[in-house]
Design a protein with these regions (language model features):
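Hydrophobic transmembrane helix bundles of membrane-integrated enzymes that assemble
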Residues: 2-29, 44-63, 68-254, 299-385
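A structural signal for alpha-helix termini and helix-coil/disorder junctions
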Residues: 32, 276-279, 360
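Membrane-interface helix-loop junction between the first two transmembrane segments
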Residues: 35-40
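Flexible juxtamembrane loops connecting transmembrane helices in multi-pass membrane enzymes
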Residues: 41, 45-48, 240-272, 287-293
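Long extracytoplasmic/lumenal interhelical loops at the membrane interface
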Residues: 259-318
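Membrane-proximal cytoplasmic C-terminal regulatory module of class A 7TM GPCRs
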Residues: 388-393
Length: 393
């Protein structure tokens, strides 16, 4: 059986965007690996500067007219960029610029390019770690060894695979074949075997189950639009629910204690962080201490304190203003999905909303390509329907 590799056709007006995006993806994936020790300090800022300059040049060359929506979007993006950049959130600052500059490019095309880049980087990094070119750190917990596979934390590689899984599901939709599902299960299982990352593996399996249900029109997918309407508010519901749990958490309440234990102490750590650092309108730099290694394989010193909830991390690091805009924009994006009857995108974004309650990696573009949907749906050219997948080709 021959393997077909389809390379999306890139227009002249898109070339600078994809050059910039490729540089960004490669750099910020490498930033998560032991390869990063060979790069100069603050290399991420230099990369961000180059990417932004390329994107600005592409805007000047390719965009003839800026409509009112694009102008409002630009103002909001500049505000969010300033907030994130000032708190040293280089990857997030870059993400905001890419979301805006990718507004007129097919999300399907971006998704396919992302898959190719990510697969290439995963192969390069994993093989490099096995060949001894970079370190393959191993954690031993109980009777199980967890390999980092060249990354600086065991969860990073599986998180990239999870993103690939969601992108494949969205690209294929009803055309997703059983051989595709089996290949994705094998790929996820491969990285689960070496890293024991249950979260990414479990969510990948869940997303594939949803894809199968959607493919064969089981349960409510054809008629129950009320469920889809509820999904529109996924980000508001998930953020409010988990924040409420953190604020009211008490070990004296048995069900809360059991839930906290099940979630790996996330409620307790989140509450402690809120009490320790508080919240502000514009955010601030916070030196949380996690389990990840530095570029030389050393663990951070100090007591462990990490906030895995994306919503609370955004609230504390980037501030109330950023979080309000973030949730409002995402809710409007979900509403547009509902209006366009793009139910697959609506469901996948809802799954990501749930995932964000317990995993902050979803904030970053190299782990979550679906942020591009914001620009395409809200700021893209009016002639692009962005409804069902076939309308985007």
């Amino acid at each position: 059986m021959k393997m077909k590799v389809y390379i999306p056709k890139i227009k002249n007006t898109e070339k600078l965007f994809f050059v910039s995006y490729t540089i960004y993806m490669i750099a910020f994936i490498l930033n998560q690996t032991f390869y990063w020790r060979y790069f100069p300090e603050k290399m991420d800022r230099y990369v961000l500067l180059v990417c932004v300059l390329l994107l600005a040049l592409n805007e000047i060359v390719s965009v003839k007219i800026i409509n009112f929506r694009s102008l409002i979007g630009l103002i909001i993006c500049l505000l969010l960029f300033a907030i994130t950049y000032s708190t040293n959130g280089n990857a997030v600052a870059g993400m905001i610029v890419f979301i805006y500059c990718g507004r007129n490019i097919s999300f399907e095309k971006i998704a396919k390019i992302t898959i190719y880049i990510t697969v290439f980087m995963l192969v390069l990094i994993t093989v490099s770690s096995w060949l001894g070119i970079i370190e393959n750190h191993i954690d031993y917990r109980g009777n199980r060894a967890r390999q980092y596979l060249g990354f600086r934390y065991t969860l990073y590689a599986p998180a990239l695979i999870y993103n690939i899984t969601l992108l494949e599901i969205y690209i294929k939709q009803e055309k997703l074949k059983w051989k595709n599902i089996i290949c994705l299960l094998i790929l996820n299982g491969f990285f689960f075997f070496f890293t024991n990352s249950r979260l990414s593996f479990g969510l990948s399996v869940l997303s594939l189950v949803i894809a199968v249900i959607y493919k064969y029109k089981f349960v409510f997918f054809n008629k129950n639009h009320f469920v889809y309407l509820i999904l529109v508010f996924s980000y508001l519901i998930c953020s409010g629910f988990f924040y409420g749990l953190m604020v009211t958490f008490s070990r004296n309440v048995l069900w809360m204690k059991n839930l906290n234990d099940f979630l790996g102490n996330r409620l307790n750590l989140g509450q402690y962080s809120l009490l320790e650092y508080g919240i502000s309108a514009w955010g601030k730099q916070i030196a949380w201490v996690g389990n990840g290694l530095d570029v030389y394989g050393n663990r951070a010193t100090g007591s462990y304190l990490w906030v895995d909830c994306l919503y609370v991390q955004v609230l504390q690091r980037y501030g109330v203003i950023f979080l309000i805009i973030f949730l409002l924009v995402l809710t409007i994006t979900m509403w547009v999905c509902y209006q366009k009857k793009n139910y697959m995108l609506l469901m996948l974004l809802s799954l990501i909303a749930v995932h964000c309650m317990i995993d902050d990696l979803q904030l970053y573009l190299h782990y979550n390509t679906f942020w591009f949907a914001i620009g395409s749906l809200l700021l893209g050219r009016s002639k692009e329907k962005y409804g069902k997948l076939k309308q985007m080709k």
